[in-house]
Structure formats: C-alpha cells, structure tokens
C-alpha cells in the first residue's frame, strides 16, 4: 500500500524526500520550484543528481510532480499562456530526467508524471477554453519527448475553474 503527502521542497528539491520521510509516507507529491513563481529555467543536472542521491537512500517509492499554481492553459493572453506551457515543460523535463536517473541507478522508485490545474475560463468561451488547454498540453508533450504523463488534476469547478468533469 502507498500512502502519500504533498511536501515542501523549500531549500532544495532533495528536501522534499526527507520531508516525506518525516511524515512516515512512501509516496510524495512535490513542486520542484516555488509554487507561485513562473518556472522558466530547466532544473540543473546537479540538482537532479542531489535529488537522486537522496532518493537512493530513502524509503520513498512514488513521486508525483505538481505544476505551479500560476499555470492557466485556458488563458487567451499569449504571454501568460506561453509561461504556463513553459512551466509544464520545465517540470515534465525534470520528470523525464529523474525517471532516467532512477532507471540508470536501479533505484526502487518511480515518477508518476506531472499533474496540474488546467486553469480557469476567463476571456474565452467554455469550448474555446477546453480547446486552448488541449492545444497547450499537446505543445508541451511535443516539446518534451519521453514516457512521462501529463495529468490534469480535477477541480471543484468553482469560479470558472475547468477540469471538473
């Protein structure tokens, strides 16, 4: 059985692993960067090596990466739409590289993918918002080749939030 928790990665992404272990769980959900800042720079190989070193010595088996909270792929604003896509590219790239490191090092752990809130309907119609989200997701998947999943987190659907069904 797997039991997990969303943990902080403050002070370095490797801290998410030790924070999860403090709670006695074997699965964690993490945000590799600050949740309320645009993630536009790829996570370095050195950061990933430190993360893998920590993971190798841990009891964490499952890791889900959560996208930043600023992502709204339903936005019509081209700059905000692009920043949202790039944040997902950064996280999906991180997931791919960590999964590769897990395989190479034969670590008994797994990256489950990147989940994110799809966004809120603001400027566009409901149908156009869904089309925009679909286009944004496909763009991200085309940018980052690999096997990691891009997962939409369901929402309550309040305030124009999309992803409720």
Language model segments and positions:
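N-terminal pre-domain/capping segments
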Residues: 1-67, 71, 77-90
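Active-site acidic/histidine proton-transfer and metal-coordination neighborhood
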Residues: 57, 73-165
């Amino acid at each position: 059985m797997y039991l997990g928790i969303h943990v902080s990665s403050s002070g370095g992404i490797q801290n998410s692993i030790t924070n999860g272990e403090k709670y006695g769980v074997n699965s964690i959900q993490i945000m590799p960067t600050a949740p309320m800042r645009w993630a536009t720079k790829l996570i370095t190989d050195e950061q990933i090596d430190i993360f893998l070193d920590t993971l190798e010595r841990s009891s964490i088996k499952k890791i889900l990466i959560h996208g930043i909270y600023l992502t709204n792929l339903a936005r019509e604003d081209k700059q905000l739409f692009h920043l949202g896509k790039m944040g997902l590219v950064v996280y999906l790239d991180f997931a791919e590289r960590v999964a590769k490191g897990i395989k190479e090092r034969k670590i008994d752990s797994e990256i489950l993918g990147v989940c994110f809130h799809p966004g809120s309907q603001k400027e566009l119609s409901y149908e156009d918002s869904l089309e925009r989200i679909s286009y944004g997701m496909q763009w991200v998947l085309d940018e980052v080749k690999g096997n990691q999943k891009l997962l939409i987190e369901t929402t309550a659907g309040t305030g124009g939030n999309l992803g409720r069904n």
